[in-house]
Amino acid sequence: MKQFLVVLLILSFVHGIIRVPLKRQKSMRKILKEKGKLSHLWTKQGNEFLQLSDSCSSPETASEPLMNYLDVEYFGQISIGTPPQQFTVIFDTGSSNLWVPSIYCTSQACTKHNRYRPSESTTYVSNGEAFFIQYGTGNLTGILGIDQVTVQGITVQSQTFAESVSEPGSTFQDSNFDGILGLAYPNLAVDNCIPVFDNMIAQNLVELPLFGVYMNRDPNSADGGELVLGGFDTSRFSGQLNWVPITVQGYWQIQVDSIQVAGQVIFCSDGCQAIVDTGTSLITGPSGDIEQLQNYIGVTNTNGEYGVSCSTLSLMPSVTFTINGLDYSLTPEQYMLEDGGGYCSSGFQGLDISPPSGPLWILGDVFIGQYYSVFDRGNNRVGFAPVVFYETTTNGA
């Protein structure tokens, strides 16, 4: 009888886990660079491209820097409606809303992506409220709708989401994603929309109120990574998870004890705040600190991009984040990004987040790619452990 109960518990746990394969594709930065548009983007956006105001705290509107999504390379699939309409999205722990382009959107960015057709879904319910997010110098606007959302065969009923009818500039036009699915706390959501993961919890679709993220940093691998909703994969990391308490519920915000370069504490000597964000590819920090950090690691500024010849990586120092008493080190090979042609760009970027939310550091994919990350809503904490890299051979539960 005891063995039967153990087996039953295991089966129940597996049933409540949703494994979402992540694909790794070219980032907007690489696409824009190949098309010769990157320097124009830096010039056009100016400082606003690298600033985030505290207006994101308002439930009616939000402000996001375009730079957050410029380097994102990891995407997953969802569907909305009945019959299902497919979309490629960023699973973003730095925001809380779900939005996709609407068929009524005529912006260039929309016409090049999958667009939601409410009239073709038998489960669609109109909401009609306006939706607004500011991205850099442009705005994403739309209306709210309600429909079922499916992630890897698991369907969330009555999910409120945004249908964008206008998207900013030409930047999203070159992106590999249609929309964004936010995984942050509900109080960060525009228009007080309940996030998808919160509805999964409320509708008993996941076994545990947490999720794990693995990002494969090998550019030659077909396996981009995996998002596990309702659990985490112990085979993806070594040792034990180091649990870090959330300091402010909104973003997945934590305390960083200090930041070292070559073993010497340079930044955050008295501690500082950081958010763990799958929707930001790089590691960002206050622009003054990041400029110093670029000098410490030895990269040079060329047309707004910091980098060096890849042949010099062995001469560069490691950068270490001390979090909850443990050191998380990144080698030059881990924090520098190979752009091709023997050039490597810095994985650090200046981003000024104004008070009261900031200043903040953002631990994006450059960090998460080296440390498996578990986001635990039930206990309001984040767990980290060194990633174990291996190729995925099956999609088993």
Swiss-Prot record:
Pfam families: A1_Propeptide, Asp. It is found in: Endosome. Glycosylated. Contains high mannose-type oligosaccharide. GO terms for molecular function: aspartic-type endopeptidase activity. The active site is at D92, D277. One of its GO terms (biological process) is proteolysis. Residues 1-16 form the signal peptide. Keywords: Aspartyl protease, Disulfide bond, Endosome, Glycoprotein, Hydrolase, Protease, Signal, Zymogen. Residues 17-49 form a propeptide. PANTHER family: BETA-SITE APP-CLEAVING ENZYME, ISOFORM A-RELATED (PTHR47966), CATHEPSIN E (PTHR47966:SF26). This is Cathepsin E. The gene is CTSE.
